[in-house]
Amino acid sequence: MKASELREKNNEELKKELLELLREQFGLRMQRGAGQLARPDRFSKIRKDIARIKTVMNERSVAGE
């Protein structure tokens, strides 16, 4: 997911996307703890997507949108 794509979404869509990613990250963390993690590369992708969403949300809050 690119930051430019995220900037086109409104705040509600960003919050929804963030919540989905956080849930997926939690599920992956549980799988890793149980030793059943199939795709460890997914961790870094999710973490970076979460950071991108939070960055866009912070940009908007600083700009006063």
From Swiss-Prot:
Q: Which GO terms describe its molecular function?
A: structural constituent of ribosome
Q: Fetch the CDD domains from UniProt.
A: Ribosomal_L29_HIP (cd00427)
| Recorded family membership | Belongs to the universal ribosomal protein uL29 family.
Per its UniProt record, what Pfam families does this chain match? Ribosomal_L29
Q: Which UniProt keywords apply?
A: Ribonucleoprotein, Ribosomal protein
The molecule here is called: Large ribosomal subunit protein uL29
GO CC annotations? cytosolic large ribosomal subunit
Looking at the keywords, is Membrane present? no
What InterPro entries has UniProt attached to this entry? Ribosomal_protein_uL29, Ribosomal_uL29, Ribosomal_uL29_sf
One GO term of the biological process aspect: translation
